[in-house]
Amino acid sequence: MTPRYVLAIDQGTTSSRAILFDRAGDIVGSAQREFAQIFPQPGWVEHDPREILTSVYATLTELLSRGQIDPRHIAALGITNQRETTVVWDRATGQPIHNAIVWQSRQSHTICERLKSEGHEALVRERTGLLIDAYFSATKVRWILDHVEGAQQRAERGELLFGTIDSWLVWNLSGGQAHVTDYSNAARTLLFNIHTLDWDDDLLALLDIPRAMLPQVRDSSSVYAHTRPQFFFDHPIPIAGIAGDQQAALFGQACFQPGMVKNTYGTGCFMLMHTGAQAVRSRNGLLTTIAWGLDGRVEYALEGSIFVAGSVVQWLRDGLRMIERAGDSQALAVQVPDSGGVYLVPAFVGLGAPYWRSDVRGAMFGLTRGTHKAHFVRAALEAMAYQTRDVLDAMQSDAGIALTELRADGGAIGNDFLAGFQADILGVPLLRPRLTETTALGAAYLAGLAVGFWTSREQIAAQWGLDRRFEPQMEVARREKLYAGWQQAVAATLAFHVD
């Protein structure tokens, strides 16, 4: 029977989705399930790994049954996942020994501070391209081994396995056939040497993490295992693609040439610039990471993460009650010709790239008696664009490549005002794709390439479709004046920090 589809699992921070794509890269069907967020203490975020599995299984069942999809028509399965989130489980029983510690969680902060105080930042930066931060997986693993009785000894005996969410899903979908991850996820653990392309013994020793726990690292497009027959009505499907969510979006946006950039406007913003075979070391507070591994070689990227983007609109809606629906923000923003000199620096949980300051908090500047709700909302949307420019200016400086366009995805960029203002403040066109599910599409493309469903990246690039192109309209002098005001606001925010 000729395969018609590729299936993607998009396992995110708040929900799991299953999306079926046809050969043209169009969506045939989808299903989604949310799951619980667990907050044991302020600043800690955990998930139940078993509930994540249940949510994934439910989406697969719903998608296939509702669409009456014959599993024999599915060529392959690709997985994309929330990165850095950490699971440790029992090799024999498959049961997790602790909740998954989520990428957002700060519970391993003290371990990070110890590593910094011992002077290990330069080593970690050189080997991994990352900063010492609780964001990444390594200190989360150390925390679990420290806080679950007997875990260190069991790990040393080879009884425990570690994985990011992709590894956890492949292990369970395959019935324990494969304990694997891909280069893009391994590069986010703080344990992987992005130059030698292997787990780094010095970093493992630094945190006393046994190598026996770690998954095998493979290309992002490869047949790792097959699904257990019971998942697809006794029809095993090759699990053939893995990529962390932001790298998958870069692939789904067909950013295959050095210098191409995508920005995902979600709860936060995540920008990746493809840098090809070169691992560019940042001088400006960005992360050097692996984009993907294909055909036995890896390609690299520069990454900048903004902690608060679309969530500022949720704050306007839920916290301040300024709007009833997120979509109302656009209508309010265009009621005024500008923000009236108001700047919002949404450092609610600190500032990410390129500042990396967790000790600052949000601030607002330029308020007058004439400031009203529309100015406030407009300033909140403009803050996303200013933060994006901060990161993209750093990327261009690091890579020595001038930005010619920005490919944008994510829910927030459906806001036409934001898209237009972003193009204005960057001075380059913003391209919004026809298909916004670029993360899942990237995972599908990687899986499809592994089994020959798609033949090449050139074929994939030709399928990329444009919804709308936003050209910059603002005069250069006005653009730079507005951005200078933003820089002043950030400088003042950095000066007013918390202990």
From Swiss-Prot:
What function does this protein fulfil? Key enzyme in the regulation of glycerol uptake and metabolism. Catalyzes the phosphorylation of glycerol to yield sn-glycerol 3-phosphate.
Q: Name one GO biological process term.
A: glycerol catabolic process
In which family does this protein belong, per the annotation? Belongs to the FGGY kinase family.
Q: Which residues bind glycerol?
A: 83-84, 135, 245-246
Residues involved in ATP binding? 13-15, 267, 310, 314, 411
Name of the protein: Glycerol kinase
Control of this protein's activity: Inhibited by fructose 1,6-bisphosphate (FBP).
Recorded hits in InterPro entries, A to Z, give: ATPase_NBD, Carb_kinase_FGGY, Carb_kinase_FGGY_CS, FGGY_C, FGGY_N, Glycerol_kin
Which residues make up the binding site for ADP? 13, 17, 267, 310, 411, 415
**Metabolic or biological pathway, per its Swiss-Prot or TrEMBL entry:** Polyol metabolism; glycerol degradation via glycerol kinase pathway; sn-glycerol 3-phosphate from glycerol: step 1/1
* Higher taxonomy: Bacteria, Pseudomonadati, Pseudomonadota, Gammaproteobacteria, Lysobacterales
